[in-house]
From Swiss-Prot:
Keyword Transport annotated: yes
Record key words, sorted: Cell projection, Cilium, Coiled coil, Cytoplasm, Cytoskeleton, Protein transport, Transport
Assembly and interaction partners: Homodimer. Interacts (via N-terminus) with MYO5A, the interaction is required for its role in dendrite formation. Interacts with RAC1. Interacts with RAB8A; interaction is dependent on the phosphorylation of RAB8A on 'Thr-72'. Interacts with RAB10 and RAB12; interaction is dependent on the phosphorylation of 'Thr-73' on RAB10 and 'Ser-105' on RAB12.
GO biological process, one term: cilium assembly
Protein name in UniProt: RILP-like protein 2
Coiled-coil regions listed in the entry: 65-153
Domain RH1 residues, every copy: 14-96
Superkingdom field: Eukaryota
Ranges where the RH2 domain occurs: 119-184
UniProt keyword Repeat present: no
Location(s) in or outside the cell: Cytoplasm, Cytosol; Cytoplasm, Cytoskeleton, Microtubule organizing center, Centrosome; Cell projection, Cilium
Length: 197
């Protein structure tokens, strides 16, 4: 019967060890251990409403800590995989450099094999621009859909156009001379369809 208290002390030492670790060394199990220690200490304080409110706040903080630890673990794993890939690539280049003619392009240059189906097709900046534009268009679409829903439900009256007609009655026409603004996505994907506008 005296073994469980000894086990609790061992757990306590183990849990305190998790608290002593560097934040960069924490694992998800460490977060659970810390949560257990804090929960045990809160239970010892009693059931005062202030303790209960504090407990909910601590639970939220522990959830955020767990999410950060998971993100950090994923980032570390991605970096390890990238490091291993780079090691393999360097080893391949060393073998190729010894056997064939060597082309030194510099640190910021990259040789792209146009026959490789997995080659990068866009720069990182181009992809960022496309994603940013997509998010902007998505938010505009959501706003327009929300406004349309308000019109349909009768919360907003139809707007008057400068010509005195209601917007739903007005026809939108574009002149032949007006050029449509080319978006980044259109620029990037125009080469695929063979259109050069």
């Amino acid at each position: 019967m005296e073994e469980p208290p000894v086990r609790e002390e061992e757990d306590g030492e183990e849990d305190e060890g998790a608290l002593a670790k560097s934040p960069l060394q924490l694992t998800t199990e460490d977060v659970y251990d810390i949560s257990y220690v804090v929960g045990r200490e809160l239970m010892a304080l009693g059931s005062d409403p202030r303790v209960t409110r504090l407990q909910f706040k601590i639970v939220r903080v522990m959830e955020m800590l767990e999410a950060l630890v998971n993100e950090g673990s994923l980032a570390v794993e991605e970096l390890r995989m990238e490091r291993d890939n780079l090691k393999q690539e360097v080893e391949g280049l060393r073998r190729a450099g010894v056997s064939g003619s060597e082309v030194n392009l510099g640190p910021d240059k990259m040789v792209v094999d146009l026959t490789d189906p997995n080659r990068p097709r866009f720069t990182l900046q181009e992809l960022r621009d496309v994603l940013q534009e997509r998010n902007k268009l998505k938010s505009q679409l959501l706003l327009v859909q929300e406004e349309l829903q308000c019109y349909r439900s009768g919360l907003l009256p139809p707007r008057e156009t400068p010509g005195g007609r209601r917007e739903k009655d007005a026809m939108v026409t574009m002149g032949n001379g007006e050029k449509e603004e080319r978006t980044i996505m259109k620029k990037l994907f125009s080469f695929r369809s063979g259109k050069h506008t």
